[in-house]
């Protein structure tokens, strides 16, 4: 390449560089101008938007200010109205207070006037009382001089006459009241009791716990006794029951205080006889199984009893105790059957009286629950039963009805009285209960002794198996009106001192005979 070409190349490069620079300058200036114009437009638009937003904010602020002003005006008017109402009420109260003050002032004035009048009358009465006391003293002195009696003697004589007259009038009043009450109560009670007895269809058969076990042959007695008596001793030790083997053919008698033990012994002995294997180890095993089976049976019996009566929600332990009542008797009456009968009678009578039938049945079913454990726990069975009912969550009215059905505590509710009536009705019906001859004779003697111990009684006779006592009185000592008082006193004393099933009728007879002789 020659020098000229190099020079031309350099010149061309310089011209190109200058041209490029100029073009770059022109383009940069153009871009800067466009950027300035864009910035001006953006600034203008931002200014316009700011002005528009400012106007909008101002308008919104004015609206809020207007709303707040209107709200404040409304609140002001409401408060002003409320203040006016309060002011009016305050004015009315002030007027009423002023009126009351005027009345109080008037009453105070009247009270002062009355007090002055009372003071004047009191002074007058004091003077008259002194005068009257003086006159009474003078009259007493004159009466003592005339009658020859002191004031104390005269007072005692007057009190005696007033007492006799009062007792006479009280007897007449009691006779009228009792007659009316008996007429009304007797009709209602007879209707309710008759309805209950007619609607209840229970068994009227006395049940007794069986204590005799039949044997297939006389040889079985020897096997039960065992070598040197070891089998019978093992059976008695395991069950707590005495086995009596005597000359009675093919029979073993079981004797024990606890009916449950007697039942376990009966079940075990029957199973041993049926099995044929009788030795001490086998006896202990069978007795243990019989105890478990009886436990299950007791619950089943209790559940069946609650189902038959229609009572639900009873604690499982109470159900078990109900089952134990199957093996408990009272005057030869089965206690479980008696409790179910009382529950049914309570339900029927409660329905007739408009009471809660279910609660009445519940109280009737549980009223003798204490008899299930009364041989293990000291105290009256009614109190024991109430404690058990309380322990297992029964309500207060049920607990009270149980505790009061023999009046160990006074009955304070209609339910308690209803259970008493049903209990008496179940126990007093013919054939329901029996008692020992010695107890029967002693009860009759005690009954006659109470009547004979009353003043004015000449003779007393217990009749109808002790369910009625007839009392003959001396007509010279007891009049017709006093007869009613005497009858009531005898009834109360019998209720207080004797224990008896059902009711005892007290009849007082006053007879006056006039005998003349024609000559």
Curated annotation (Swiss-Prot):
Purpose: Endoribonuclease that initiates mRNA decay.
Transmembrane segments: 3-23
GO cellular component, one term: plasma membrane
GO molecular function, one term: RNA binding
Top EC class of this enzyme: hydrolase
SMART domains, alphabetized: HDc, KH
PROSITE patterns per record: HD, KH_TYPE_1
EC number from the UniProt entry: 3.1.-.-
Domain KH as annotated: residue spans: 209-272
HD domain location: 335-428
Topology of this chain in the membrane: Single-pass membrane protein
SUPFAM superfamilies for the chain: Eukaryotic type KH-domain (KH-domain type I), HD-domain/PDEase-like
Subcellular localization, as worded in the UniProt entry: Cell membrane
Main location: membrane
Keywords per UniProt: Cell membrane, Endonuclease, Hydrolase, Membrane, Nuclease, RNA-binding, Transmembrane, Transmembrane helix
Organism of origin: Oleidesulfovibrio alaskensis (strain ATCC BAA-1058 / DSM 17464 / G20)
Protein name, as recorded: Ribonuclease Y
Name of encoding gene: rny
A GO BP entry: mRNA catabolic process
Family, as annotated: Belongs to the RNase Y family.
